[in-house]
């Protein structure tokens, strides 16, 4: 599962046809050291000169749907985000850092919590891969993000569209692959320090890194931290409950040898975000805050969450003749707690403990008559335990496996690839009886409705067992029509088993402002998606067009419940929602063009559009929930200095981020509402500072939402909080004007 980067070189070049940082496939310009270990090659040639023909993004080696291949040879749509791009982009979390990419959005809960969305699909439809294994941390929840520290990410691959072939259930929308930095060449030792500050919420972050390779023994140690007080905007002022604190530690230890490598990675991640409830004073309309509340405090306001994530991954790769055998074993422990009682601040309400064991074994066979084959098996075992005094989902056990085979062949200018996979998942949910609990409620297990008058001696959760299976695959081609013009076609089938929340949730908590009810009769989702892609590059223009059509059967979503008088059903004074399903069709695509008429000047434009329709439904339920609005991003970038004596890559960029009005929303019982359009003006600048020909530090400055525009993104969950009775505006608005500074200091030892 782990990407075979096979020697990626990250470097900065000032060229009219390229971005300031590119990942280059070393094999295209230097084959004399072909026996160098793949992990060392990227660094052992870091400072070697490249020819101009090498510096093309299409030469990046990516995972793809069928194994390692050049980006231009992958028929499926893939985006690559380099280390330099991540450095330059101010953000509050790793999903926020990549949400500017075409086709990628984020469901947000305030400024610090983001869930990834790819082409209108999110939650358990996006698989996140980190350290080679899929990240498992209660993805069904809205109110917490991805347990990955931004400082630990070196580059990102974004696979758009069904990727169940390699990653199994849940990869309906695509996959986010977060890569750590490659190990260094023998004899190298390096350190790195970075820090940053943002003015709106006082966000302060830092990262320390030390890596090396002595005689094949490799290590990479990183510690990072972050803290932020409440953010502010023009309408709400400081938003109580939006503060956060983050700490992360990672340690890689391993051995590189001629026949392969063995690496052990240990990760710890701790996040303490507040919970925005959005309650308002009816007379003033202002957000309610506790007495003596300091909006700029970095402390933990009540209520708040606490997330601990531990991970251990053993990554082995062995070269067997011309073949390659890979084995990954992983363990993850995720614990999420919610604290909400002022009287008992150490007593948590919800307390989830999730244990996950990951395994992945696959073999890449030697090339035979131009054909490349790989086969493998991967999956996971899970156990979830309820340790708190409140309950939302039952305790459960899960085991799944998937067996797959892939192939690819290059025939002149034509590249063919495809594969097939079988998945099986078994879920066993445990019963929970609550006695004398007036707050316990049950839903009909067949999803037919709500029974709010259950006896006090009742089951909160009924025990059940479900098994799901599916056959998926993909077939595609990439054809080089001209040296700088490529055509891509791909057809893929996706599969997703319902998650535990969709099947059997029965409860409410501070983070969602919803009482959610599951439905054990739900069927697995399956989809067919067709992709058409074209890209063109020249010294003056670079352009790309990617179109898709996706048909999903048994698409699962939640809808707001109403009584016979069309009034919202309330449980414990909280609106009730229940999961249901239907068939859906999603159409859309992304277009980008970068015009650079003169050296150092770039005029870029990207446009993303998604139209998500539920088939055979009336107008109020025609559109799927959480569909991102059409988005147009335009920027002008000028590089003033390239490879100067003191400054390098000195640039300024002006950006217009235009989100169009979203009139396509799921309107049943006011589950969603329309979202007005808005435009944000941003400005970015940066440079490398050199001393004696070497990079001393990198400095980045930015100003986002320069006009301090008050807006709500359509995917903001805070949009549906309390109504301001004074102004009539509903919910909490997104962050206002924000300036930031970031400094990165590399240290060669």
Language model: regions and residue ranges:
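Short acidic/polar hinge/loop motifs at secondary-structure boundaries
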Residues: 133-160
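Outer membrane beta-barrel strand-and-loop segments of large Gram-negative receptors
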Residues: 347-362, 517-523, 529, 538, ...
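Transmembrane beta-barrel wall of Gram-negative outer-membrane proteins
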Residues: 201-227, 237-276, 304-321, 367-368, ...
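Structural signature of Gram-negative outer-membrane beta-barrels, strongest in the C-terminal barrel
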Residues: 368-372, 378-380, 388-552
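Flexible loop and strand-edge segments within Gram-negative outer membrane beta-barrel domains
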Residues: 228-230, 240-242, 246, 260-321, ...
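Outer-membrane beta-barrel translocator/receptor signature
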Residues: 137-139, 152-154, 165-235, 242-249, ...
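Gram-negative outer-membrane beta-barrel transporters
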Residues: 548-551, 569-662
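C-terminal beta-signal and adjacent terminal beta-strands/loops
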Residues: 553-554, 558, 660-665, 687-749
């Amino acid at each position: 599962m782990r990407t075979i980067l096979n020697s990626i070189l990250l470097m900065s070049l000032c060229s009219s046809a390229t971005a300031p940082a590119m990942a280059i496939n070393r094999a295209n310009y230097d084959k004399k050291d072909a026996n160098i270990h793949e992990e060392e090659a990227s660094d052992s040639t870091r400072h070697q000169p490249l020819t101009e023909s090498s510096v093309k993004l299409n030469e990046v080696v990516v995972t793809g749907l069928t194994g390692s291949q050049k980006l231009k040879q992958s028929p499926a749509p893939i985006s690559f985000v380099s280390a330099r791009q991540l450095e330059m982009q101010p953000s509050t979390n790793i999903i926020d850092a990549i949400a500017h990419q075409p086709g990628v959005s984020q469901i947000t809960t305030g400024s610090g919590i983001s869930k990834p969305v790819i082409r209108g699909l999110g939650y358990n439809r996006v698989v996140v891969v980190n350290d080679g294994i899929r990240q498992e941390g209660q993805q069904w929840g809205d109110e917490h993000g991805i347990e990955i520290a931004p400082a630990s990410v070196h580059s990102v691959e974004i696979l758009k569209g069904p990727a169940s072939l390699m990653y199994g259930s849940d990869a309906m929308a695509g996959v986010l692959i977060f890569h750590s930095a490659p190990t260094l060449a023998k004899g190298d030792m390096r350190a790195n320090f970075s820090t940053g500050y943002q003015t709106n919420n006082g966000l302060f972050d830092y990262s320390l890194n030390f890596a090396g390779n002595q005689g094949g023994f490799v290590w990479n140690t990183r510690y990072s931290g972050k803290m932020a007080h409440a953010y502010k905007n023009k309408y709400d002022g400081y938003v109580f409950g939006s503060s956060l604190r983050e700490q992360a530690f990672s340690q890689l230890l391993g051995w590189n040898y001629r026949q392969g490598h063995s690496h052990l990675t240990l990760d710890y991640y701790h996040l303490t975000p507040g919970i925005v409830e959005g309650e308002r004073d009816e007379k003033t309309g202002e957000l309610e805050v506790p007495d003596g509340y300091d909006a700029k405090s970095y402390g933990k306001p009540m209520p708040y969450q606490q997330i601990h994530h531990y991970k251990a991954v053993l990554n082995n790769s062995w070269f067997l003749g011309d073949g390659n055998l890979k084995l990954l074993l992983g363990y993850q422990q995720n614990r999420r707690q919610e604290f909400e009682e002022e009287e008992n601040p150490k007593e948590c309400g919800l307390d989830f403990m999730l244990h996950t064991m990951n395994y992945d074994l696959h073999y890449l066979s030697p090339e035979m008559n131009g054909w490349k084959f790989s086969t493998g098996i991967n999956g996971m075992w899970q156990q979830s335990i309820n340790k708190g005094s409140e309950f939302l989902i039952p305790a459960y056990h899960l085991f799944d496996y998937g067996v797959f085979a892939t192939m690819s062949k290059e025939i002149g200018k034509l590249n063919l690839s495809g594969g097939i996979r079988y998945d099986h998942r078994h879920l066993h949910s445990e019963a929970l009886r609550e006695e004398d609990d007036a707050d316990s409620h049950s839903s009909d297990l067949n999803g037919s409705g709500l029974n709010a008058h259950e006896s006090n001696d009742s089951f909160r959760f009924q025990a059940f067992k479900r098994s799901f299976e599916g056959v998926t695959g993909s077939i595609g081609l990439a054809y080089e029509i001209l040296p700088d013009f490529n055509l891509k076609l791909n057809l893929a089938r996706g599969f997703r088993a319902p998650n535990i929340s969709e099947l059997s949730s029965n409860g409410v908590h501070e983070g969602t402002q919803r009482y959610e009810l599951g439905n054990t009769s739900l069927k697995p989702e399956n989809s067919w998606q067709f992709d058409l892609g074209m890209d063109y590059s020249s010294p003056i223009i670079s352009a790309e067009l990617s179109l898709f059509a996706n048909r999903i059967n048994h698409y699962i979503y939640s809808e707001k419940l109403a009584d016979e008088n069309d009034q919202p059903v309330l449980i414990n004074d909280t609106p009730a929602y229940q999961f249901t399903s239907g068939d859906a069709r999603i159409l859309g695509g992304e277009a980008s063009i970068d015009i650079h008429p003169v050296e150092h000047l770039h005029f870029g434009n990207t446009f993303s559009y998604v139209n998500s329709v539920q088939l055979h439904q009336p107008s109020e339920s025609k559109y799927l929930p959480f569909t991102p609005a059409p988005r147009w991003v335009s920027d002008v970038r000028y590089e003033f200095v390239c490879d100067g004596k003191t400054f390098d890559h000195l640039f300024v960029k002006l950006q217009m981020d235009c989100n169009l009005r979203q009139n396509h929303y799921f309107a049943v019982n006011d589950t969603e509402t329309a979202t007005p359009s808005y435009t944000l003006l941003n400005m970015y600048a940066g440079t490398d500072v050199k001393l004696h020909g070497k990079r001393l530090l990198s400095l980045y400055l930015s100003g986002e939402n320069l006009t301090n525009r008050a807006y709500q993104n359509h995917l903001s969950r805070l949009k549906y909080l309390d109504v301001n009775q004074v102004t009539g505006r509903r919910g909490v608005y997104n962050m206002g004007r924000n300036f930031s500074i970031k400094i990165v200091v590399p240290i060669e030892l």
